């Protein structure tokens, strides 16, 4: 961990990858510790910004890392500014993209935004939600269409004057596309400026983002200075590696754990996270003391699965998931480690149940699979399935789950 991060309170430093700028000279524009101190002295909570573009429908545990940090600021008495990027989502953040993103309609963005807020806990008890929506002074929900929808051409030109083509092409994603001859639409250059202008509009002190967001957050800092505001600090958190152990967690890569999944499915997936990621998951997704863990790697993995599941589903649901996971093999195996694994890479999705069990060689043929299912001999994660035509849309519907035929045939689905 960087020295300037070590100096921060634990609730801020945990999981933090970078804080910029990091000059602790005492200037509140350059020193976050000084800004934090002034906030306490003046009894003026920091305004902590997190922007989300509702380009999809589901939140996964990788997304939750940023929301957990925002909640930590709320719990410390500061104000969370949750910006719903209903305007910028129609452009699409070009970060990490090798081609221009498809633009979404207003209705699509609005529907996605409502789904996001529900998953974040709007209307729920704070102890059961990712963010605390119960105290008005602790959260502002803003939509950036409030200030971007009616931005006139004069203001757009003023924004554009604060950046250069050279600066934009220095951004890795643009640079790679430019060098390879892949088209870059002019509206994509606007995205970092519009995200930066969000910081001006809400006068943020801190902006949270993934490690891929440094350019955009720095743009916000520059624009705040140009508009006569105290510039924000950028706090960057890691991008969670997915269940495949190789690539970032992403629904399009079928390697996610969704926060809306049932507790047994969540626990089962987490229990099979690659060994080298277990401590990372514990560090980023829980508040557990990493110095007090078992020396047994398998026990640590089960502990991680239990604690992460309990954060989203509650401790009782997590314990039940762990118990039911073990019960799946009661009487046939001594432990879950004895269950063989198999990949669904050779299965064509969407897949019907009878085809799946035949393709995974759990049954000798599709007709046998139909007979077994109709006869009540087939289970998934301990739940009996009776419809041979039950459809699984993507590998993510199955990864981490245990397939069972009869009393002795088990298989755990892997990536």
Swiss-Prot record:
<comment type="subunit">
    <text>Homodimer.</text>
</comment>
<keyword id="KW-0067">ATP-binding</keyword>
<dbReference type="InterPro" id="IPR024088">
    <property type="entry name" value="Tyr-tRNA-ligase_bac-type"/>
</dbReference>
<keyword id="KW-0030">Aminoacyl-tRNA synthetase</keyword>
<dbReference type="Pfam" id="PF00579">
    <property type="entry name" value="tRNA-synt_1b"/>
</dbReference>
<feature type="domain" description="S4 RNA-binding">
    <location>
        <begin position="351"/>
        <end position="415"/>
    </location>
</feature>
<keyword id="KW-0963">Cytoplasm</keyword>
<protein>
    <recommendedName>
        <fullName>Tyrosine--tRNA ligase</fullName>
        <ecNumber>6.1.1.1</ecNumber>
    </recommendedName>
</protein>
<feature type="short sequence motif" description="'KMSKS' region">
    <location>
        <begin position="248"/>
        <end position="252"/>
    </location>
</feature>
<dbReference type="InterPro" id="IPR002942">
    <property type="entry name" value="S4_RNA-bd"/>
</dbReference>
<dbReference type="Pfam" id="PF01479">
    <property type="entry name" value="S4"/>
</dbReference>
<dbReference type="InterPro" id="IPR002307">
    <property type="entry name" value="Tyr-tRNA-ligase"/>
</dbReference>
<keyword id="KW-0436">Ligase</keyword>
<dbReference type="GO" id="GO:0006437">
    <property type="term" value="P:tyrosyl-tRNA aminoacylation"/>
</dbReference>
<keyword id="KW-0648">Protein biosynthesis</keyword>
<dbReference type="InterPro" id="IPR036986">
    <property type="entry name" value="S4_RNA-bd_sf"/>
</dbReference>
<feature type="binding site">
    <location>
        <position position="251"/>
    </location>
    <ligand>
        <name>ATP</name>
    </ligand>
</feature>
<dbReference type="GO" id="GO:0004831">
    <property type="term" value="F:tyrosine-tRNA ligase activity"/>
</dbReference>
<dbReference type="GO" id="GO:0003723">
    <property type="term" value="F:RNA binding"/>
</dbReference>
<feature type="short sequence motif" description="'HIGH' region">
    <location>
        <begin position="54"/>
        <end position="63"/>
    </location>
</feature>
<dbReference type="InterPro" id="IPR002305">
    <property type="entry name" value="aa-tRNA-synth_Ic"/>
</dbReference>
<keyword id="KW-0694">RNA-binding</keyword>
<dbReference type="GO" id="GO:0005829">
    <property type="term" value="C:cytosol"/>
</dbReference>
<comment type="similarity">
    <text>Belongs to the class-I aminoacyl-tRNA synthetase family. TyrS type 2 subfamily.</text>
</comment>
<dbReference type="InterPro" id="IPR014729">
    <property type="entry name" value="Rossmann-like_a/b/a_fold"/>
</dbReference>
<dbReference type="GO" id="GO:0005524">
    <property type="term" value="F:ATP binding"/>
</dbReference>
<keyword id="KW-0547">Nucleotide-binding</keyword>
<dbReference type="InterPro" id="IPR024108">
    <property type="entry name" value="Tyr-tRNA-ligase_bac_2"/>
</dbReference>
<comment type="function">
    <text>Catalyzes the attachment of tyrosine to tRNA(Tyr) in a two-step reaction: tyrosine is first activated by ATP to form Tyr-AMP and then transferred to the acceptor end of tRNA(Tyr).</text>
</comment>
């Amino acid at each position: 961990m960087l020295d300037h991060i070590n100096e921060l309170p634990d609730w801020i430093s945990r999981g933090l990858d970078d804080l910029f700028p990091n000059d602790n000279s005492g200037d509140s524009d350059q020193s976050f510790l000084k800004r934090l101190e002034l906030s306490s002295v003046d009894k003026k909570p920091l305004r902590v910004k997190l922007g989300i573009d509702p380009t999809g429908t589901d939140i996964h545990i990788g997304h939750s890392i940023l929301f957990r940090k925002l909640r930590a600021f709320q719990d410390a008495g500061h104000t969370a500014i949750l910006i719903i990027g209903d305007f910028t989502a129609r452009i699409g953040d070009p970060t990490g993209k090798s081609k221009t993103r498809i633009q979404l309609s207003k209705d699509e963005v609005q529907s996605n935004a409502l789904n996001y807020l529900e998953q974040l806990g709007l209307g729920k008890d704070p102890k059961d939600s990712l963010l605390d929506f119960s105290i008005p002074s602790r959260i502002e929900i803003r939509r950036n269409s409030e200030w971007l929808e009616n931005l006139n051409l004069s203001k757009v030109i003023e924004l554009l004057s604060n950046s250069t083509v050279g600066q934009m092409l220095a951004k890795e994603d643009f640079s790679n596309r430019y060098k390879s001859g892949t088209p870059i639409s002019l509206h994509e250059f606007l995205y970092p400026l519009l995200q930066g202008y969000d910081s001006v509009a809400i006068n943020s002190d801190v902006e949270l983002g993934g490690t891929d967001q440094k350019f955009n957050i720095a743009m916000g800092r520059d624009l705040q200075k140009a508009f006569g505001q105290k510039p924000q600090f950028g706090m960057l958190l890691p991008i969670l590696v997915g269940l495949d152990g190789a690539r970032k967690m992403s629904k399009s890569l079928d390697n996610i754990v969704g926060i809306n999944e049932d507790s047994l499915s969540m626990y089962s997936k987490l229990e099979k996270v690659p060994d080298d990621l277990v401590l990372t998951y514990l560090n980023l997704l829980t508040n557990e003391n990493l110095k007090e863990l078992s020396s047994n790697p398998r026990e640590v993995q089960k502990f991680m699965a239990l604690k992460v599941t309990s954060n989203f589903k509650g401790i009782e649901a997590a314990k039940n998931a762990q118990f039911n996971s073990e019960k799946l093999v009661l009487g046939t195996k001594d432990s879950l480690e004895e269950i063989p694994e198999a990949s669904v890479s050779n299965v064509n999705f969407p897949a019907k149940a009878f085809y799946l069990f035949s393709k995974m060689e759990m049954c000798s043929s599709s007709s046998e699979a139909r007979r077994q299912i109709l006869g009540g001999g087939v289970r998934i994660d301990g739940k009996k399935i009776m419809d041979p035509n039950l459809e699984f849309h993507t590998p993510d519907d199955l990864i981490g789950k245990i397939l069972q035929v009869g009393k002795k045939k088990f298989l755990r689905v892997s990536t």
